[in-house]
């Protein structure tokens, strides 16, 4: 470093800055050598396009030189990372812009606090500091006003307070009076003079010589070169007797620890995300809509799958869950099945003694008619044992079911389904119990009524139940059994039980002249089909959610483009790349999480419609599906919000500040 002065705060050596212009480069700064001492008030003067603003950007670490070396308080900046440069801007520099660059969503107080948020000061410390600065700048009654409620002079004073927030050693003022009337401009210059009197280093960029003459030193730049560097003949007295703007205030204040500092920056990003969403409510809602529909559809489809599964299980209870049905032959289509007579009542008695069997009932059937008075209808007679109703999960809604004595005595006890009441007794509201009806030519007495069995068929023929012994003797004239239903104990696996029953009957018959239908296998196949269908429909819903995520990415890219100036301001006052990334990522996640919450409500409202219209299937919601949906919507926000947020964080501060 050429400059050996102990009081040198900024030193530039052979600085060159080039910008690409098509296939060539334009040189804006040419071999700049400059030393600025601590406590100087320097004015950089030049015409528009002379390179003075580019020089200020390099001085303030908003831009990097193409060639050359730059020291700040003895530290060379060439090898510093983006976050290290942001730390320099945060701790050493305060920027006063011609266009103020205040954030419209924040109050004057909020704008002034921003640098201290990124510096990690506690909320109460930075709030008091901001209030003190605004009060000393004559803004006490405007603390809670937003920028659009302030005049140009007032906005510039807020900008000055923001520049002083972190006790900046160097104040960089770019055309500080350029957008102000004469009175406001003089007030700003007076404040800069006071800051200079406190011992701060003031660097003003201006094209107005009257403004420049207030400085100790005037540097003229033309066509990217310093053509004059004159020291003012009028010496100014510096004093530290009155620290009007609290130069020492933050020296005794400790910054927050890493985690608390991160939490404060997260809170700031969260609040800004809410403010940004509120500023564009309709656009935010339309962006959420894709997420709402996608999450709602997934929630509803999963709930529908759960409801369908429960309905199937309920229907299986009426068909008999965990049961084995033993039939003669090799299969239902075996033409020799009718000739096989080896399946007998003794098999049922033997099976009932097995330890893993909780119930056994022989079965047979016959077709006939049922008649009461002048009413006659076709029926299927089911001859069953007393345990049949238990194995099928059927209970009497009126009267009783026949018992072992009824089976043993070949009783003429008849159990009918509830649907048969309207057919046999269309004009009577009396109890059917005890009434005698004719099944075929056999008079039988109604002893009980059950709910109809859901067998999945579409036949309209009524079904009635008699003891199988009665059917054998009164209707079929044979002791042959056409089927045996075995109820397996709930603690036993039905597939294992099926294997054991098969071996047991082969030992009894000497051959496998029967086949077994396992209700569990049938149930599993239907459940698998239901699961596949639910997965298919949920996949379609997930695609709509992904489309919604693409919409979030699109809007976030638009948001970054619209708020590029805000990004530049935040970087200028010390925001790290991670702070910018966090802010826009939180906004994307927030859009998706709120959309996910609304989507869950939407999905639940679909279940309400099912109840309202008395659909046969009810939607069953689970906490797992709700948590999964919220997690999925959060991941959508992270995945589709990361790219725009990363793009925002990688912006060059000087490029961002130059965009409106």
UniProtKB/Swiss-Prot annotation:
The UniProt GO MF terms for this protein read: ATP binding; ATP hydrolysis activity; transmembrane transporter activity
Is Translocase there in the keyword field? yes
Report whether Lipid metabolism shows up as a keyword of the record: no
Q: How does it sit in the membrane?
A: Multi-pass membrane protein
Which principal EC class is assigned to this enzyme?
A: translocase
Which residues does the UniProt record annotate as the domain ABC transporter? 10-248
Q: How does it assemble?
A: Homodimer.
Its job: Non-canonical ABC transporter that contains transmembrane domains (TMD), which form a pore in the inner membrane, and an ATP-binding domain (NBD), which is responsible for energy generation. Confers resistance against macrolides.
Family named by the database record: Belongs to the ABC transporter superfamily. Macrolide exporter (TC 3.A.1.122) family.
- The name this protein goes by in its record: Macrolide export ATP-binding/permease protein MacB
